[in-house]
Amino acid sequence: YDYNAKETYRAELGAIGGITDARSLAKLLTPLAQNNGELLSRNTVNELSKSNIKTPIDNMLLFPTNFSNGFMLNMDNRSKFEGEGGSFMIGHNAFGHVGYGGSSATFADPNTKVSFGYLTNKLGGEYLINERAQNLIDETYKCLK
């Protein structure tokens, strides 16, 4: 099955069918990163940073995961998972999500007031994000120090 085919893009697949650009993806989360109460109340945004599902081994992904309501939280599985793409390392109070096959990474970080969007042109073989995406996230945080 070719997830990069135009026919697949037109299929409107809910869980994996988001088609956008990186700037728009980051812009979507900007009000949450700024946490000014514009889109959601400050209390609701604060709740998005709190873990409510943390698994030692996720039944689908087969490695540890950490989720809030609707978002992924920091997941550093480098010492627990063999292979590339088993981690999503973001700030302590940041929340976001990755795309299927390592195709995207987005997060909002209310501590730094930064939103981040990254997209690839094609799907890869990673579970969460690819090394390039993680390097960009790491460099973003270094620039904020």
Residues covered by each model-derived region:
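Catalytic loop of the DD-peptidase/beta-lactamase superfamily, centered on the K-T-G motif
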Residues: Y1-K145
